Amino acid sequence: MFRSSEPVSPLDDVVTKATDENLTTENWQYILDVCDEVNNDPENGAKNVITSVTKRLNKKFANTQLYALTLVISLSSNCGSKMQQAIASKAFVKTLMKLANDSAVHKSVKSKVLEVLEQLTDEYKKDPSLRLIEEAYDELSRKKPDLKAPAKPEKHKITEQERQREEEELQMVLALSLSETNTSGSFQQHHQTNSQIQPPVNNSHFATDPHQQQQQQQQQHNQQDYGQQSNNANTNNNAPAVEDPTPTVATVSRVKALYDLNATEPGELSFRKGDIITVLESVFRDWWRGSLRGQVGIFPLNYVMPIAEPTPAEIEKEAQEELSVFSQSRNIEKLLALLSSQDAARLNLAENEELQSLYHSTLAIRPKLVKLIDKYAQRKDDLVELNEKFVKARRVYDDLMEASMPQYGGAAAAGGYAGGAQGGAPAGYPSAQGAPAGYPGTSGTPGTPGYPPQYPPQQQQQQQQQQQQQPPYPVQPLQTHQQQPQQQQQQTPYPVHQYDNTQAHGRQGSTDSGRSQRMYSQGGQGGQGPTDLHPATTGGSGYGFPPQYGGGAPSAPSAPHGGAGGPGGPGGPSAPSGAHSGAPSAPPSHAPAASAPHGYGSPSTAHSAPYGTSPAASAPARHSPYINGTPTSNLGQQSPVTSQSIPIPNNNNLAAPPVQGLYSHGTSPPPPVPNAGPPPSNFYE
């Protein structure tokens, strides 16, 4: 019967799928599928695919022809030398030349043919058997010079003067955008003065279409006429009108691509004809950096054309057009209501003038409405892209901040002290080691959170004044341990040194002579380590006394149980003398106390005399008849002190009231604090 005019190829289906005219862009998955089919048939794959591609090139759809040319490039790169021989055959080259010389073919397709021939020429340059492609490229370039894209300019670095000029132009544009009172004459005069100092940019850097070039020339001619009229009207301005300089990176924010550009070097930006590129900065003399669809790269200026920003008149005109479109919404709703009513079927539409008028008025706004839809759809895409960039930048910023926070946080924690700030310590005393965190310290020390001061503000002020007059006196650093509530109340207004039981001072009832031989091994204020040992002398008054005693040593109390260096020494809470003369010699067994840790004396440890004072001149001993459940009368005996602590009643109500002041012999102690519990004697009763 009848035979088809076109040969049938087993690859027609996959080639048709990869070059479908309904595709919006190249589908590289389909293109690679075609390459796989060709490689699976080494004998006839190249011949069959050329047959299928030739049929697609003869179609009248521009999209199909463009996708087929893209497929040719991929086949040449992925299917070996046999495929390259088929592409460089005389029949296929003739098909390409026929397509480029056809007047019915779109110009973009002709430009694509020339681009494919140029790329194949560079690829086949080393193979003389494929020179037919190079000959076709030279012939087409000679006959159709308008199809060839301009050559890429060389990448010359911008000099410092050019960069400074661009910066000055940017500042000038910002100043002019903020100024609303400048006239046209002064604006042109400013440009003339600037052009005399700085060389203008060459217009040949940008590519222009013929129609757009004519429009620009007409606009420039009109601007010159308008400038001359303004200069004639303004008698103060004698400068002639000059042409505005070519837009630079300071004045251009967007450019439009006039040719397709495929990036051949790292850092270049690929784009297609008609793409709108956002200008970021100038990198080289004829290259700018821009952003397109989330990609950032450089592009040559001769491949793009600057887009002029709309003038205020154009913006106002566009707003009026949008307003006219939205004003027709009422007529559209009215027309829809009439056509949707029950009487619409009985109406004679051809004779109803109201319906005809409404219908024709709504038809007129249809093109404007479609234009507005495209405009705001593009703006939506731009805003979505901008939001994605912002989210990405914010994520990177947050990650960098999180990575840097542990570094600075760890350094701050390592350099700090648990005792708090150093500004609140009294003068002459080290503040960093005076009171560790969690332990009560002297008043005015910020390192004792959670503990109220144990002295009234008046006495505290007096003590601070005394301490300021005293020489620096180091305090033994304390280690972390837990104290009983009674020990928390036995704070002294004088520095106290604790020693480890018998290793520190031998026996409990040591004499004044033994106490005078104690050494102070901690020296310096800044924690500089031990210094020379200084024995405590028996004479001298290096350590002052509170003003209650007039600066001298007070008389010893008459309490029968006051040991010279007993726990009732300076700083300990006092009890009324003779209140417990008949107290039992052993405490109750229901409240044992934990033993003191190593390095700290038991509560019965004697306190050392202050540095530079004799034992006789030390502060009076305030005593309690029972210390850790042991009568104080037994403390004067020569019984060895062991490291075993004696249990005491662990009852907060047994604590003596806080010391409100110092009192000498013969004076009564202060009254107990209200709501502080019964006196200690009630417990044994």
From Swiss-Prot:
Residues 144-168, 182-247, 432-685 are annotated as: Disordered. GO terms for molecular function: phosphatidylinositol binding; ubiquitin binding. It is found in: Endosome membrane. Residues 144-166 have a biased composition (Basic and acidic residues). The keyword DNA-binding does not apply. Residues 182-206, 499-522, 627-645 have a biased composition (Polar residues). It comes from Yarrowia lipolytica (strain CLIB 122 / E 150) (Yeast). Belongs to the STAM family. Component of the ESCRT-0 complex composed of HSE1 and VPS27. PROSITE patterns: SH3 (PS50002), UIM (PS50330), VHS (PS50179). The keyword Transport applies. Component of the ESCRT-0 complex which is the sorting receptor for ubiquitinated cargo proteins at the multivesicular body (MVB). This is Class E vacuolar protein-sorting machinery protein HSE1. GO terms for cellular component: endosome membrane; ESCRT-0 complex. Residues 668-685 have a biased composition (Pro residues). Residues 165-184 form the UIM domain. It is a peripheral membrane protein. Residues 18-148 form the VHS domain. Keywords: Endosome, Membrane, Protein transport, SH3 domain, Transport. Residues 212-241, 432-448, 457-498, 574-584, 591-604, 646-658 have a biased composition (Low complexity). Its main location: membrane. Residues 250-309 form the SH3 domain. Residues 539-553, 562-572 have a biased composition (Gly residues). Coiled coil: none annotated.
